[in-house]
Amino acid sequence: DLAPGITLDIMTPSDVSFLDVERGKVDMVINRFDSMPQSFHQIHLWDDTFSCILNVDHPMLENFTLDNYLAGDHVWVSKTGMGVGVGVNPDDVQRLGWVDLAINKLGKKRQIRVFTRHYQAAMTLAEQNDLIVTLPTRAALLKRDNPRVVLRDPPLDIPPLELKMAWSPLLQHNPANRWLRKLIADTARELDGQEPTL
C-alpha cells in the first residue's frame, strides 16, 4: 500500500472541462487529446493500437474482411455515450472517432447500433450479441481469457492513439500531485515495455 489514505475520483472525459484542470480542481487528465491549452504540462504515457472483440459465435468470425466488418453491427465507445453531432453541452458534441476517421478515409461507413461511454459495457455487449467492438488493444486485452469472445486485428489500418497525461501549471510543484504523476508515469512505462499481444 503506497498511499493508504488516498481517495481517487475517476471521471469520464465528458465530466471534466479543461477549465477545471486549468484551475487545479482536477489533479490530472489522462486521455488522447486532439488539442490542449499550451499552459498545461503533459507527458506521453503510451501509444496503443486497436483490436476488435466479437463473440465466439459471431457469423463473421470465419470471414472477417473489411466488407463484412463494415456490414456488421458495431458498438461505439464515445466520450458522451452519444452519436456524432449529439451532446448536452455544445462543447462536448462528439466528432468522428479514431476508428471512424480511418473508415471515412476509405470513403466508407460502418453501422453503429449502440453508443456507450464505457469500454466494459461495450465489451459485455459484444460478448452477448453479434456486435463488433473496436477499441484500444490494452482495453481489449482485459477480455483475452474470456472463452466467450475472440480478439481480432481490425481489417483496416487505424492509426495508433497516443495516450497522454496533462495537468495544470498550478499543480506542477504540488508534492502529492507530483508523487501521483510519477507513480502513473512509472506504471505506464512498465506497461509500455510489455507489448500487447492478441
Region roles according to the model:
Residues 1-37, 116, 198:
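Central regulatory/effector-binding core of bacterial HTH transcription factors
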Residues 36-49, 130, 143-153:
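Ligand-binding "clamshell"
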Residues 5-9, 111-113, 150, 162-164:
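Residues at or immediately flanking beta-strands
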Residues 66-67, 77, 149-194:
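A late-sequence structural motif
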Residues 13-17, 22-26, 88-150:
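Hydrophobic hinge/microswitch elements
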Residues 60, 64, 70-106, 174-175, ...:
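Secondary-structure junction motif
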Residues 40-55, 67-72, 154-162:
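Short Pro/Gly-enriched coil loops immediately N-terminal to beta-strands
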Residues 33-34, 56, 81, 136-139:
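Short secondary-structure boundary segments
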